[in-house]
Amino acid sequence: MGSKSPNGEDRGPNGPSAKKAVASINPPKSAAASGLLRGALEDQDEDGDDDEGKIGADMNVSEKTANGTKKRRRNNKKKKSAQAAQQTAPPRVEIATLFHNRPYPEGEIVEYGINDENLVRTTDEEFRHLAVANNMNDEFLRDYRKAAEVHRQVRQYAQTIAKPGISMTELAREIEDGVRALVGHQGIETGDSLKAGMGFPTGLCINNVAAHWTPNPGAREVVLQHDDVLSIDFGVHVNGRIVDSAFTVAFNPMYDKLLTAVKAATNTGLKESGIDARMDYISETIQEVMESYEVMINGKPLPVKALSSLSGHNILRYKIHGDKQVPFVKTRTSQRMEEGDVFAIETFGSTGIGRTRDDVGVYGYSRNENVSTAGVHLASAKSLLKAIDENFGTLPFSRNYLERIGVKNYHLGMRSLIASGVVECYAPLVDTPGSYVAQFEHTVLLRPNCKEIISRGDDY
């Protein structure tokens, strides 16, 4: 989910360091980013032949005993192995069922550079610290890997249905229903969506819409066309640990270079991320890669521009945006990444002016926990705030989410909460009309001994 640059500026902040997210520090293992589970267990022995069937047949042969009576030997043929659970299409099998008694897959494990003296752990005290921390953060890592696997399985299905002719309402519903089914929390009962579910409303941004657009109840239906560029951005959380990842699809090959540029820029940001990595260096490197591409749109060459008004961001528990930012353009900032941080590394590339503005409409809302509720006096506002706190906390939510849990006649109360600053409202962000914007994003965990690109999959 894209983070707006503070105060509308085009560069990263020099703000204070964010609170450290809980560090996940299991020892590095081989990278294994899985997609949908495929196939079933095969009923074969190690050499691949079916010796067991022949043995069973022989064991069934009746033999005469010494007193002339017949004795039938027990058939020792093993029962066939049960088939491994498989995901459905659309995905509706809870992820805990698919991975019963098995660990969730790791993301892409990337070792830190061994030549970086700031990252080398050599002292006995440091090794003891790592050993203790390894035993303290299993839950953190398990939650993140579960959320990431849900994201992979849901987005793989979304890619099969995100085709010309589908409405954005249907696409958002399939994504969000899939997430809720796979985490095992429908979010209808009070507080259930805080256990696991959507990290924020599904973003479905077409053409010059860069970020923060989702279908709203009663709004005009939007249907995907062949010449559209569609960015799909959604988050999955388990116990408040949010995986934020996004990708872009296009059906006309003239947009291929745009998608390639943005994907390359995001991968550059991931490559340069790490403990003590400087935000200004990462930002400059991202822009250099992004803007080295050019795209031909209807016979006209256009440069790919990095959006200056959006940025990547760190993620805190139950808060999709922390107070650290990773811009996509050259910036001056003293911020660095730290051990234990969780970052959403994302980039947006545009054929427009490379800067967004607020459009009409509403994407969603979020609770501002730093603003006092003492000024909230309207009864409808108090009732709405209670529903928000009990069901969403500080997670962003949309009008659809409110209506889904049965909240009605909320508009007056919402206006009051926004006016008092207790709730923040997000508008869609757009570049110039006629331009095209693409986005790619991954979540990375900065563990002490490696970084784990937790949302990495076979698709991107």
From Swiss-Prot:
Positions contributing to a divalent metal cation 1 binding: D233, D244, E441
Cofactor comment: Binds 2 divalent metal cations per subunit. Has a high-affinity and a low affinity metal-binding site. The true nature of the physiological cofactor is under debate. The enzyme is active with cobalt, zinc, manganese or divalent iron ions. Most likely, methionine aminopeptidases function as mononuclear Fe(2+)-metalloproteases under physiological conditions, and the catalytically relevant metal-binding site has been assigned to the histidine-containing high-affinity site.
Reactions listed under catalytic activity: Release of N-terminal amino acids, preferentially methionine, from peptides and arylamides
Cofactors demanded by this protein: Co(2+); Zn(2+); Mn(2+); Fe(2+)
Region (Disordered): 1-90
Gene Ontology MF terms: initiator methionyl aminopeptidase activity; metal ion binding; metalloaminopeptidase activity
Major location (coarse): cytoplasm
Extent of the signal sequence: none
Binding site for a divalent metal cation 2: D244, H313, E346, E441
SUPFAM superfamilies noted in UniProt: Creatinase/aminopeptidase, Winged helix' DNA-binding domain
Protein localization: Cytoplasm
Keyword set includes Transferase: no
GO cellular component: cytoplasm
Classification via Gene3D superfamilies: Creatinase/methionine aminopeptidase superfamily, Winged helix-like DNA-binding domain superfamily/Winged helix DNA-binding domain
GO biological process: proteolysis
Assigned EC number: 3.4.11.18
Record-stated family: Belongs to the peptidase M24A family. Methionine aminopeptidase eukaryotic type 2 subfamily.
NCBIfam families: met_pdase_II
Alphabetical list of PANTHER family matching this protein: METHIONINE AMINOPEPTIDASE 2, METHIONINE AMINOPEPTIDASE 2-2
Function per UniProt: Cotranslationally removes the N-terminal methionine from nascent proteins. The N-terminal methionine is often cleaved when the second residue in the primary sequence is small and uncharged (Met-Ala-, Cys, Gly, Pro, Ser, Thr, or Val).
Annotated protein name in UniProt: Methionine aminopeptidase 2-1
Organism of provenance: Leptosphaeria maculans (strain JN3 / isolate v23.1.3 / race Av1-4-5-6-7-8)
